[in-house]
């Protein structure tokens, strides 16, 4: 059923909030990892199929593959964030509008039932009864084990899971197939310290990266060099089996070497990077698969400078990033970066598909907005920078639409993706995430501007380390805050945006969505 034209809608706070939630839900539904996996199943193997993977969408991806191949010899292990093992799909509370999601991302909004042959396991790797239940409601024998570990700072469970994954791909033959299911969050979940480093060293590195203000590209360039499993090392361990990597992208530009720090993508792979002018509009509209056979089969395309070209020294790049942000890394990590390492060999029989990505979800939200009578404008899927600065800039664009009808007239919605950063100073931080911090800065910049509402949230359902996906703001946000005795500037200064929005009851709480295509921001002007 098509929504009524906006001209017949009375825009009030409740309506605007409902519409923003509908747009967020459309974006998340489009990134349904199970549906995406089913659309990109590789050729069946002659021998065994070993499934490995890491990320916030790993459980749903594994369940979909397992259910699709009941007659194939499937086994394996994947790792996801604590509490995400049962997140087989997004349960949108807002009603779906007009089937816009299906047209925008070539996916349906139907949610798959969890496969009965994927079992949730404790951190020790022992299947837990009644994990992901079969359709009949009882747990079935496990073929793919789902482990849980910590995010964003790894724990001992991350190390155990990584060892299990490496063990799973040992001793295979060219007749066997390894399917690597990679999604956002994998950099922490897939943790195996490089020789000479300990878990404590890796934890210290992660904290330094998270507090530095570095972009996700820069952080993962460093992580790749300090790991015994990332940076193509998982692919190298899987030889001589055939390898297929299915990726749900959560990084600006969809660079497969950066997503989860590229466990199956070596520095010398020369993978085609799906960014900027190197990716056509038609690729964006169809999901932009990056389908590759041998690493040398396609033309080399430019990566973002920070990620480096294939000819650059990745260790030197990592050292430069550490120096640029003044990171204090453990001596063992610095020693690894200073010691020349043998190059990781690219896998000779590797196919890679990016099966869901931020731009696909933004287009799904834009389609839903049009069905609601709004004019959408996608500002981009790769917005980066300090969360406070991003919020201020986005507020300026929203104000221009409200006051001058530029760059487009109201009623309209401005959509964007990417990943903001939050630089934590020596004074420490309160409770917050990059999306709530961006929104708080936006609210301050907008002031009491009439007719502007906004939502910013992480599509995985968790903004930072808190239990909310993000939050919403409205024209009366600052007025309500001051009436409650809250000083919004102090909350922003203390990086305590979660507490600010919690006090106003403006947090967006979804629970784990089972997918992750980075941040989603929508500014509604009516």
Give residue ranges: language-model regions.
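Accessory alpha-helical/coil subdomains and C-terminal extensions
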Residues: 241, 266-274, 296-393
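Intrinsically disordered, low-complexity terminal tails and inter-domain linkers enriched
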Residues: 4-7, 83-141, 271-312
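Glycine-rich oxoanion-binding loops at beta->alpha junctions
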Residues: 82-87, 136-174, 222-223
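N-terminal glycine-/serine-/threonine-rich phosphate-binding loop
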Residues: 2-50, 59-71, 77, 131, ...
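A glycine/threonine-rich phosphate-anchoring loop and its flanking beta-alpha core
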Residues: 210, 216-274, 288-317
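N-terminal amphipathic/basic leader segments beginning at the initiator methionine
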Residues: 2-48, 52, 85, 258, ...
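Gly/Ser/Thr-rich active-site loops/lids in small-molecule metabolic enzymes
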Residues: 197-215, 268-271, 299, 304-324, ...
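Internal helix-turn-beta structural module
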Residues: 437-526
């Amino acid at each position: 059923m098509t929504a009524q034209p906006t001209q017949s809608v009375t825009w009030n706070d409740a309506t605007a909030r409902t519409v923003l939630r509908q747009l967020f839900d459309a974006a998340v539904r489009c990134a349904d990892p199970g549906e995406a996996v089913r659309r990109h199943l590789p050729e069946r193997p002659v021998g065994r199929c070993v499934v490995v993977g890491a990320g916030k969408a790993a459980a749903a991806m594994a369940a979909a593959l397992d259910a699709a191949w009941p007659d194939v010899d499937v086994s394996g292990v994947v790792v996801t964030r604590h509490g995400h093992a049962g997140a087989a799909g997004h349960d949108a509370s807002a009603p779906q509008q007009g089937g816009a999601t299906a047209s925008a991302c070539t996916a349906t909004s139907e949610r798959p039932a969890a496969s009965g042959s994927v079992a949730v396991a404790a951190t020790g790797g022992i299947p837990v009864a009644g994990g992901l239940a079969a359709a009949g409601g009882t747990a079935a024998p496990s073929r793919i084990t789902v482990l849980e570990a910590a995010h964003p700072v790894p724990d001992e469970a991350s190390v155990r899971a990584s060892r299990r994954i490496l063990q799973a791909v040992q001793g295979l033959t060219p007749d066997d197939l390894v399917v690597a299911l990679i999604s956002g969050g994998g950099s922490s979940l897939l943790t195996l310290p490089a020789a000479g480093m300990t878990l404590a060293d890796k934890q210290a590195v992660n904290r330094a990266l998270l507090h530095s203000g570095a972009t996700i590209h820069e952080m993962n360039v460093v992580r790749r060099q300090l790991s015994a499993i990332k940076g193509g090392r998982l692919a190298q361990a899987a030889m001589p089996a055939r390898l297929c990597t299915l990726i749900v992208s959560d990084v600006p530009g969809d660079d497969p070497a950066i997503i989860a720090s590229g466990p199956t993508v070596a520095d010398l792979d020369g993978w085609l990077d799906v960014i900027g002018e190197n990716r056509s509009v038609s690729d964006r509209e169809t999901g932009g698969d990056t389908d590759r056979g041998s690493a040398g089969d396609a033309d080399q395309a430019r990566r973002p400078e920070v990620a480096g070209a294939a000819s650059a020294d990745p260790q030197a790049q990592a050292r430069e990033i550490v120096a640029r942000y003044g990171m204090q890394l453990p001596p063992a990590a610095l020693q690894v970066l200073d010691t020349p390492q043998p190059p990781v060999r690219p896998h000779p029989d590797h196919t890679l598909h990016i099966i869901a990505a931020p731009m696909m979800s933004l287009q799904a939200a834009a389609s839903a907005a049009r069905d609601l009578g709004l004019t959408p404008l996608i500002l981009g899927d790769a917005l980066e920078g300090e969360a406070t600065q991003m919020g201020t800039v986005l507020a300026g664009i929203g104000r221009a639409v409200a006051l001058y009808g530029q760059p487009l007239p109201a009623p309209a919605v401005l959509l964007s993706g990417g990943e903001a950063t939050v630089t934590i100073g020596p004074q420490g931080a309160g409770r917050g995430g990059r999306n709530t911090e961006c929104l708080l800065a936006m609210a301050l910049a907008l002031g009491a501007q009439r007719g502007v509402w906004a939502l910013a949230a992480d599509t995985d359902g968790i903004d930072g380390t808190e239990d909310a996906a993000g939050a919403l703001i409205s024209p009366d946000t600052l007025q309500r805050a001051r009436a409650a005795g809250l000083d919004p500037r102090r909350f922003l200064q203390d990086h305590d945006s979660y507490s600010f929005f919690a006090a106003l009851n403006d947090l967006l709480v979804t629970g784990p969505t089972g997918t992750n295509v980075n941040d989603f921001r929508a500014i509604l002007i009516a």
